Amino acid sequence: MPTTTDAASPARPRTGRTAVRAHASVRVERGPQGAPRLAELRSDVPIVLRMTGVSPVRTGARAGAGARADPGPLPTMTVHLVNGAAGPLAGDDLRLDISVGGGVRLVLRSVAATVALPGRGPGPSRLTVTAEVADGGELDLGPEPTVVADGADHQISTDVRLAATARLRLREEILLGRFGEPGGSILSTLRVDVAGGAEGPGADLAGGPFGWVPLLRQELLLGPQVPGLRGPAQLGGARAVGSLLVVAPAWAGAGPDAAVAEGVARLPLTGPGYLVSALADDAVTLRRRLTALADPTG
């Protein structure tokens, strides 16, 4: 039976005056009739998860390990993240675990931006996201921007493990400061591994016969403590920073061509994917620039 914890359940005991710990999770699998099945949906305030849509089973959508070609449109489940409280605040330690089975697609969105705020808790606020995607599965993770308010110190750590034929679309957007204020500090770390390498037959979420192959390691540090942050070699006058990572077996051979436009660049990776990075003055322009180079066949 699916495990669902009501989003209104109280937060876990606080570790200080303002610090709170929360651990939420979502797990989607392929059901007996091919439709996506919500195996687990556990909210933990302030991380509140709500299922908001399920697509019908599409004839011809392929599932299971070993399906190395593009599986086409997959049965899709959509889940939205709702912030159940203000923040995160200093000292908060939040975690979200994501698991996607073979032959299904999970679209994970948020209903609003996350605003990292200063507080009285010990150390920075932290958000840790872990994700695993099985062969033939797909994760589309695209929350609304993280706004780093003046005086905030926030850390985001994202770890993704992909089976050999899994697909991923991961978007991250950061805004330094609310309207009319300077931004705080943020450290964002992204690690993505592919099981057994893109060409390793039989690779699975245990790492496959060839173990885990790093696809991307990216660390981004922004804030007033960074020397030259507003210089032409870094942000210049931009206050919005974003990236879009696309991973699919179709890019295991020759990746897409590199491309550059105003405020945005697309770079192929040594592996089955490519990375789009962009700068902008505001969130709307940032999203538009990321989208412009997101599809190399368009």
Curated annotation (Swiss-Prot):
The keyword Repeat does not apply. GO terms for cellular component: cytoplasm. Its main location: cytoplasm. Pfam families: UreD. Keywords: Chaperone, Cytoplasm, Nickel insertion. It is found in: Cytoplasm. One of its GO terms (molecular function) is nickel cation binding. Required for maturation of urease via the functional incorporation of the urease nickel metallocenter. HAMAP family: UreD (MF_01384). Belongs to the UreD family. UreD, UreF and UreG form a complex that acts as a GTP-hydrolysis-dependent molecular chaperone, activating the urease apoprotein by helping to assemble the nickel containing metallocenter of UreC. The UreE protein probably delivers the nickel. This is Urease accessory protein UreD. The gene is ureD.
